[in-house]
Amino acid sequence: MEYNLYSKDSAYPCEVTIDEENGRYMIRKADTSGEIFNSAAELTSWIRSNWKETDFRSKKQYYYLMELLDEYEWEVESGQ
């Protein structure tokens, strides 16, 4: 899964990458720095702790990302 959403503070999008096949779990933040995680669970936890709807141009994009993360977590937990 790759997802982009636009921060109020940057011309470049924030990017979320969850790639189970290749073991890549990373984000690019508004300041274009990044974070790399050991698992999708760590990445999701970081996003929920550090990003808020008010950080982004579109609340809709933010909530859609949260839905995607919820669905992803459900699929992993249920083994689908």
Identify the meaning behind each predicted range.
Residues 35-80:
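Mixed-charge, Lys/Arg-enriched low-complexity segments
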Residues 8-31:
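Short aromatic-glycine-(Arg/Gly/Cys) micro-motifs in beta-strand/loop hairpins
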Residues 1-5:
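Short, hydrophobic/aromatic-rich segments at coil-to-beta transitions
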